């Protein structure tokens, strides 16, 4: 089985090729650039480097969000188009779960974080058990202050991952003290190779029914709905 993994859900643009249990190619950038004009060329480049054609792919795996609304849509649309045109399965993985996978060697809880503005974050709680990543608390959009108080009650070490942790480092330290750990710079980029491994084990989704998981409405949508009441 050869899997193509695609992640455009945040600043990170990640593409990976997984053949059986071997990562044969991986492309990652962390740049504030338009994924819509870079994602497909990156896929073609990676395939060409590996002397492969799209028809050699067995499955598509995509990061479904949360994250940048535009970024999530780009990745999901590209992945669905490829899966449909090639008539191969597609699986979707939480962007937070993908980031949490970077905490593989941490003995404790893992909280990946994307900033959601106004004191809110997208996050969830994960841990590794017997070498496998499992979800402890579902992904959600939550006030960071409330989230940290919940983590404090668990009284366990917590590893925070994601570039946006820099925005909240002081609050994390103030609430959790020595129980709060910030990941290294290398751990803050979600890796498409981890996305591929996670998606390999997930059931195939309906290619037409698969939609991004924003965890909340885009601001413009929310305002429109409110105006209709």
Swiss-Prot record:
InterPro entries: ATPase_NBD (IPR043129), Gcp-like_dom (IPR000905), T6A_TsaB (IPR022496). It is found in: Cytoplasm. Keywords: Cytoplasm, tRNA processing. One of its GO terms (cellular component) is cytosol. Its main location: cytoplasm. GO terms for biological process: tRNA threonylcarbamoyladenosine modification. Disruption phenotype: Cells lacking this gene display a slow growth phenotype. Cell size, shape and nucleoid morphology remain unchanged. Belongs to the KAE1 / TsaD family. TsaB subfamily. Forms a heterodimer with TsaE. PANTHER family: TRNA N6-ADENOSINE THREONYLCARBAMOYLTRANSFERASE (PTHR11735), TRNA THREONYLCARBAMOYLADENOSINE BIOSYNTHESIS PROTEIN TSAB (PTHR11735:SF11). The four proteins YwlC, TsaD, TsaB and TsaE are necessary and sufficient for tRNA(NNU) t(6)A37 threonylcarbamoyladenosine biosynthesis in vitro in B.subtilis. Required for the formation of a threonylcarbamoyl group on adenosine at position 37 (t(6)A37) in tRNAs that read codons beginning with adenine. Is involved in the transfer of the threonylcarbamoyl moiety of threonylcarbamoyl-AMP (TC-AMP) to the N6 group of A37, together with TsaD and TsaE; this reaction does not require ATP in vitro. TsaB seems to play an indirect role in the t(6)A biosynthesis pathway, possibly in regulating the core enzymatic function of TsaD. This is tRNA threonylcarbamoyladenosine biosynthesis protein TsaB. It comes from Bacillus subtilis (strain 168). The lineage of its organism: Bacteria, Bacillati, Bacillota, Bacilli, Bacillales.
